[in-house]
């Protein structure tokens, strides 16, 4: 069982790491540079939902046309809880990796506690596992990552943020 972690907005604000679309794209391309030396890969498997965007970028850059998903729910808003496999990797993709994942690339945005990574590793133990960001608890479970952040950091991904109007600092300047 995974312990429940409640991160309200006030707690997250002190350890916030906002990532812009531009920065995320650069980080995904940097990840691809590293992965290019490891491949080739027969398929990319995105861990949804966070792994969808980096998987698309990595697959494009590496020229991989077969993209699959494994859908695992681990967060409900800002609370991490029990893992639930909503959709497994397709049999045709598993077959490309000989059933163990050899030659397959698993991509996610972040490895946090490692719970999701551990579950996916059990499904495809020989696959190469890559994330854009890694926290210390989960880092040993991934093969390739770009940026490590502290365990108490909350990453705000660009798809979680919205552009809003910011009033001028000086009253009446607008």
UniProtKB/Swiss-Prot annotation:
Its membrane topology: Peripheral membrane protein
Q: Which residues form a coiled coil?
A: none
Q: Give the binding site residues for guanine.
A: 112, 155
- What Pfam families does the record tag this protein with? Pribosyltran
Query: Which cofactors is this protein said to need?
Result: Mg(2+)
Q: Does the keyword Glycosyltransferase belong to this entry?
A: yes
Swiss-Prot/TrEMBL catalytic activity: GMP + diphosphate = guanine + 5-phospho-alpha-D-ribose 1-diphosphate; XMP + diphosphate = xanthine + 5-phospho-alpha-D-ribose 1-diphosphate; IMP + diphosphate = hypoxanthine + 5-phospho-alpha-D-ribose 1-diphosphate
Kindly list the positions annotated as binding 5-phospho-alpha-D-ribose 1-diphosphate.
49-50, 108-116
Family, per the entry?
Belongs to the purine/pyrimidine phosphoribosyltransferase family. XGPT subfamily.
The name under which this protein is listed is: Xanthine-guanine phosphoribosyltransferase
